[in-house]
């Protein structure tokens, strides 16, 4: 049965065979920090003169607080101390926010026009796939997912993706200016800056990335020799003309298969911290008619924007509105007894003991089984932004191994420890009602070409 799905995935993406023991699933922000130990980068550079470090982040997020301390100003001392030949700091800038639009859109929400959103952490032959950034809360009180892959081939593939996007990004270099850094477009970058010529930038990006996304043809793939396969899935819609991204087509392949008779009585769990799945993803989930299914989202009190000032402070209410609309769709399809929406809350954000929820992904369990055989982990939130404006990286695990399936089931369960079911009555409560100003703000963002 899994072969029906993998045969279609083989047409879309490279495939890597791994042993189940090569995949480790981390549970908590603290465990993520202890595994990554990002604070040791400087120490490692000092101890090993042969070590080289390459960091790719987003230009809009990474410079937002300038001239106050920001990602760019915090990282650039590494370049100053160890030199450009050993430390490379790159920041990707979307081609969708330029000129007058960039000047008028507030910095706090300008990421709604596109980000470098991939979360990849590679050291030697190990790779961590996650949805987590490297800010303090992701190491302390922000729940996410973290999978460690001990595979040289898989790590090398994502390193090639990383380097290709680096060459389509600005370099961050030391400067005596107040900000402490300068953002430069290197002459050896293969194309022009996205701020100067977005169209030519896209043409070069397509030439650089398209072949990497589709390294192996179906004819080159032999029957797998292990119980576990990993498919790298990438969504580079803002860069590719035409769009040959692989994440959305793969998700479409899996969810469409679930709606066929062969997969009747399958089940799934879907989660996204920011609950704004596209209409297509919502339809695919609902049309799968699962035996049972769970959707996990952040409650407003576990949303990172809760209590923010200005337009961003409206986002928790906007996501509540979208959750209510999802339940309306579930009800109209007659699936209320099969699909449960749960909201995750652990205290209240910005209060002592309060956490935020940022996990995202999919688990699929085959008919008449109790543990998932398929899991998708990575950066995507499955939103309009993910599929039109952001750069996303994910790993799709397909396994027949019972021990790995058990670990995936445990992950699926522990993410629900702080989640409770909500129904349509919940959204009728006074504190959950959404004002007209929120609806207008949602409409305005769309009109200006952005997305939640």
What kind of feature is each model-predicted range?
Residues 103-110, 123, 129-130, 157-215:
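Extended catalytic-interface subdomain
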């Amino acid at each position: 049965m899994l072969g029906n799905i993998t045969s279609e995935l083989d047409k879309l993406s490279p495939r890597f065979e791994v042993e189940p023991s090569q995949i480790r699933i981390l549970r908590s922000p603290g465990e993520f920090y202890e595994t990554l130990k990002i604070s040791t980068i400087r120490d490692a550079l000092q101890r090993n003169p042969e070590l080289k470090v390459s960091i790719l982040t987003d230009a809009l997020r990474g410079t937002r607080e300038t001239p106050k301390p920001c990602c760019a100003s915090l990282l650039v001392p590494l370049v100053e101390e160890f030199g450009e030949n050993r430390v490379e700091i790159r920041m990707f800038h979307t081609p969708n926010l330029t000129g007058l639009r960039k000047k008028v859109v507030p910095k706090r929400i300008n990421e709604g026009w596109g980000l470098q959103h991939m979360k990849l952490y590679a050291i030697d032959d190990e790779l961590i796939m996650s949805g987590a950034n490297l800010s303090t809360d992701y190491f302390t009180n922000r729940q996410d997912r973290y999978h460690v892959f001990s595979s040289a081939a898989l790590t090398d593939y994502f390193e090639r993706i990383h380097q290709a996007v680096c060459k389509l990004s600005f370099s961050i270099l030391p400067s005596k200016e107040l900000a402490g850094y300068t953002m430069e477009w290197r002459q050896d970058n293969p194309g022009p800056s996205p701020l100067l010529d977005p169209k030519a930038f896209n043409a070069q990006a397509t030439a650089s990335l398209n072949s990497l996304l589709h390294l192996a043809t179906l004819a080159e793939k032999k029957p797998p020799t292990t119980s576990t396969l990993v498919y790298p899935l990438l969504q580079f819609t803002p860069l590719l003309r035409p769009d040959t991204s692989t994440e959305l087509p793969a998700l479409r392949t899996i969810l469409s298969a679930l709606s066929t008779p062969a997969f009747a009585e399958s089940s799934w769990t879907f989660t996204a911290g920011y609950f704004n799945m596209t209409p297509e993803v919502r339809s695919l989930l609902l049309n799968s008619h699962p035996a049972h299914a769970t959707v996990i989202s952040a409650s407003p009190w576990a949303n990172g924007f809760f209590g923010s000032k200005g337009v961003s402070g409206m986002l928790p209410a906007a996501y509540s509105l979208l959750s209510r609309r999802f339940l309306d769709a579930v009800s109209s399809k007659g699936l209320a007894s099969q699909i449960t929406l749960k909201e995750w809350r652990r205290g209240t954000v910005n209060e002592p003991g309060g956490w935020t929820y940022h996990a995202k992904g999919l688990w699929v369990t085959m008919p008449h089984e109790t543990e998932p055989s398929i899991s998708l982990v990575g950066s995507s939130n499955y939103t309009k932004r993910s599929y039109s404006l952001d750069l996303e990286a994910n790993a799709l695990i397909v396994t027949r191994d019972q021990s790995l399936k058990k670990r995936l089931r445990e992950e699926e369960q522990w993410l629900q420890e702080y989640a409770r079911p909500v129904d349509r009555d919940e959204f009728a409560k006074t504190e959950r009602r959404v004002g007209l100003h929120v609806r207008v703000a949602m409409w305005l963002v769309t009109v200006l070409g952005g997305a939640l």
